[in-house]
Design a protein with these regions (language model features):
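Short, glycine-biased loop/turn motifs at secondary-structure junctions and
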Residues: 1-236
Length: 236
């Protein structure tokens, strides 16, 4: 197992900030690059390239997904992608880290990013999306919610950015061995896509927010306006 030097440890905040910026990007996604990222992911898991539907927000995507049936879009592919690309990549890197070093990297890279990207941004957006869907779907919402929870068919860009921080650090600073095609596919997904809802025949790719506002403590906050806003006016 490897050891980490003080000089390498000093780079942790730089990688944390790098991936915070990626996770909080408000730049519109580049659709050709996003398309290439999705097609590469499907190729890796052995499936044909899907029809890709771009959506201004997760709310728009879930509205489109709700009435679909398996015959319309195929089975959910998120677990296939996570297992083949994300988890295999993580396992290769973890196998070279001792438990103590892994915990140190997680506590200083992954955990702080998770607190901001997932506990703030992701959960705020998810809660608002479900509130709006509940109003729109009425009696169908509870069944849809259960179906979403059961299938868990999404790849969340904020969570991928949290993982990207320690993966990037392990490769770029610790020089661990890794699978280049898997890392390239992983990095392309997180850098070029927002939330992803992948099915066998169709893949819904959400754009990023167009506005994010934070206070001096990096907490979501805005006076007199939404702290988070998407192009379709979904806002929190």
């Amino acid at each position: 197992m490897i050891a980490i030097t003080p000089e390498q440890t000093a780079l942790i905040p730089i990688y944390r900030e790098k991936w915070r910026q990626i996770g909080l990007s408000i730049a519109p996604i580049d659709r050709p690059q996003a398309t290439a990222a999705i097609n590469t992911a499907y190729n890796i898991i052995g499936y044909p390239e899907p029809e890709i539907i771009f959506c201004d927000s997760p709310y728009i995507a879930l509205q489109a997904i709700e009435p679909l049936r398996i015959r319309d879009s195929g089975l959910g592919m998120a677990s296939e992608i996570r297992n083949k690309i994300h988890n295999e990549l993580y396992d290769i890197l973890r196998s070279q880290l001792g438990r103590q070093l892994e915990n140190k990297i997680y506590s200083q890279l992954y955990n702080p990013l998770y607190a901001q990207l997932m506990n703030q941004l992701h959960l705020h957006v998810k809660d608002e999306v479900y509130v709006k869907l509940a109003k729109k779907l009425g009696g169908r919402f509870q069944r849809f919610l259960i179906d979403q929870a059961y299938h868990n068919n999404s790849i969340v860009s904020e969570l991928s950015a949290c993982h990207g921080s320690w993966v990037d650090f392990c490769i770029g600073v610790l020089n661990l061995e890794y699978d280049r095609p898997l890392y390239s596919a992983f990095k392309s997904l997180v850098e070029n896509c927002g939330w992803i809802y992948p099915f066998e025949q169709k893949c819904f790719v959400c754009d990023r927010p167009i506005q994010l506002h934070f206070d001096s403590e990096y907490l979501l906050h805005a006076e007199g306006q939404a702290a988070i806003e998407f192009a379709d006016k979904l806002s929190v």
